Amino acid sequence: MQITLLKSKLHRVTTTHSELDYEGSCAIDGHFLEVAGIREYEQIQIYNVNNGNRFTTYAIRAEENTGIISVNGAAAHKAAPGDLLIIATYASMDEKEAEEFKPIMVYFDEKNQITHTRNTIPKQMQQLA
């Protein structure tokens, strides 16, 4: 049986551009793609933290070390410069592969600088009143 797991995530990157008239896609700083293991033209899911929009497009490479996150084409209606995004990729694998698989999660500060990476998410704990 095949299951689908989180492959990689760019967590809380800031949208730098929103280009309605550019060919559809999301341009992502090439260094971010490398660190997260995202391939150019790979399908990505984008979750807009500011407005709740969730949409699918594909990644293209932007110039490295620029911090560019440009939402292009029709998707430009779903994200504006300054919006915080979570960009995720997923992979299908069999259950044996899934037992050993670890995603790559890349975390950012407000200036689109990488702060750290992880391959697990801390357990969510109940908040005390």
From Swiss-Prot:
It is found in: Cytoplasm. The active site is at S25 (schiff-base intermediate with substrate), Y58 (proton donor). It catalyses: L-aspartate + H(+) = beta-alanine + CO2. GO terms for biological process: alanine biosynthetic process; pantothenate biosynthetic process. Pathway: Cofactor biosynthesis; (R)-pantothenate biosynthesis; beta-alanine from L-aspartate: step 1/1. Keywords: Autocatalytic cleavage, Cytoplasm, Decarboxylase, Lyase, Pantothenate biosynthesis, Pyruvate, Schiff base, Zymogen. Its cofactor is pyruvate. GO terms for molecular function: aspartate 1-decarboxylase activity. Its main location: cytoplasm. Substrate binds at T57, G73, A74, A75. GO terms for cellular component: cytosol. Is synthesized initially as an inactive proenzyme, which is activated by self-cleavage at a specific serine bond to produce a beta-subunit with a hydroxyl group at its C-terminus and an alpha-subunit with a pyruvoyl group at its N-terminus. The modification Pyruvic acid (Ser) is found at S25. Binds 1 pyruvoyl group covalently per subunit. It comes from the Bacteria. The keyword Plastid does not apply. PANTHER family: ASPARTATE 1-DECARBOXYLASE (PTHR21012:SF0). NCBIfam families: panD. Catalyzes the pyruvoyl-dependent decarboxylation of aspartate to produce beta-alanine. Heterooctamer of four alpha and four beta subunits. This is Aspartate 1-decarboxylase. It comes from Hydrogenovibrio crunogenus (strain DSM 25203 / XCL-2) (Thiomicrospira crunogena).
